[in-house]
């Protein structure tokens, strides 16, 4: 039991080391718009949480034989809609929170709207990506002969952490160009 879990944790640990690489890639942007760093935990945890949730639901459905590996396409279509809906809900809440704090406490500066838009759009994209990754990885793990229950959710969290940073800062570069960046 320990060996099986330790192997995955070590693999995932090395995967998480890539988060520093991803953030380093956007070091200049973070330097110019430090406010972006404030939302990194919110962004990556939302993607990881949505992915883990989707992964758990698919693993359960596979275990109960409600779905089979060949049903991956049907599951993916359903999860795209779910990811967009959930991402839109969290994106709207994220934007509204930034707008409220900007109005009440005058934080985030004169470009608060663009920061809020960046966070909102990033949440939509990352929750969609997390949901898709989380729903598809159990199928991949099962197909490769691994136990999806021990590997999928942690792998999803690691994958979404690293790629979520790339998505977030990529959106920031596009949205904030000419204002904060």
PLM ranges: what are they?
Residues 25-40, 106-118, 148-149, 181:
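Membrane-water interface of transmembrane alpha-helices in multipass transporters/channels
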Residues 38, 52-63, 138-142, 153, ...:
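Re-entrant/interfacial helical elements at transmembrane boundaries that shape
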Residues 169-181:
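Juxtamembrane boundary at the C-terminal end of a transmembrane helix
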Residues 1-3, 50-77, 141-143:
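Non-transmembrane, extramembrane segments of multi-pass ion/lipid transporters
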Residues 1-40:
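Cytosolic regulatory modules rich in charged/polar residues
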Residues 72-93, 97, 102, 107-108:
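Short alpha-helical transmembrane segments in multi-pass integral membrane proteins
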